[in-house]
From Swiss-Prot:
Record keywords, A-Z: Hydrolase, Iron, Metal-binding, Protein biosynthesis
A GO biological-process term: translation
Reactions it catalyzes: N-terminal N-formyl-L-methionyl-[peptide] + H2O = N-terminal L-methionyl-[peptide] + formate
Role of this protein: Removes the formyl group from the N-terminal Met of newly synthesized proteins. Requires at least a dipeptide for an efficient rate of reaction. N-terminal L-methionine is a prerequisite for activity but the enzyme has broad specificity at other positions.
HAMAP family membership: Pep_deformylase
Organism: Lactiplantibacillus plantarum (strain ATCC BAA-793 / NCIMB 8826 / WCFS1) (Lactobacillus plantarum)
MF-aspect GO terms: metal ion binding; peptide deformylase activity
Designated name of the protein: Peptide deformylase
Cofactor stoichiometry and binding remark: Binds 1 Fe(2+) ion.
Length: 186
């Protein structure tokens, strides 16, 4: 089981490296990693388990964050209604954004990261809508359209696979700079 001590923090070179593509069929180690990353997200979103194991809540966890430089990330965006199915739940392997909106989007509260132990204020400007192509654990190619929060979460995780951290997208001179067409998501 992945715990907070297993998640590397900013300053570790793996977080700034270009991750390598994952080969199929998945090795036993890659299958275990994928399952463990999803288990972390599930446990971190359960208040009792999060408290028991000292987990920070997360909606995404990329392999580089656990010091494995591979293009794989677990994503679990819960529904607003606790009883509904998650908005998006999958392990995305070798993901590529194949199209995106011109319109930018950002979270009103900014973004956070399990690998960054400090608050960094500012709009993290991303695409409001994306079409994502990836492979699931079975090696099946998937294509999905995402908008708003799920699109932002996936872009954040894909950035990890390319050595980019969320604060790289914040305007250093004016962290809350926004064009008129920016979609702010609360």
């Amino acid at each position: 089981m992945i715990k907070m001590r297993d998640i590397i923090r900013e300053g570790n070179h793996t977080l700034r490296a270009e991750a390598k593509q994952v080969k199929f069929p998945l090795s036993e180690a890659d299958q275990k990693l994928a399952n463990d990353m999803m288990e972390y997200l599930e446990n971190s979103q359960d208040p009792e388990l999060a408290k028991k194991y000292g987990l920070r809540a997360g909606v995404g966890l990329a392999a580089p964050q656990v010091d494995v430089s591979e293009q794989m990330a677990a994503v679990l965006v819960p529904s607003e209604n606790e009883d509904d199915e998650p908005v998006f739940k999958d392990v995305i392997i070798n993901p590529v954004i194949i199209s995106h909106s011109v319109q930018p989007g950002a979270l009103t509260e900014g973004e956070g990261c399990l690998s960054v132990d400090r608050d960094i204020a500012g709009y993290v400007i991303r695409h409001d809508r994306i079409t994502l192509r990836y492979y699931n654990m079975a090696g099946e190619e998937k294509k999905i359209r995402l908008k708003n929060y799920p699109a932002i979460v996936c872009q954040h995780e894909i950035d990890h696979l390319h050595g980019i951290l969320f604060y790289d997208h914040i305007n250093g001179d004016n962290p809350f700079a926004a064009d008129d067409d920016l979609v702010l998501i609360s």
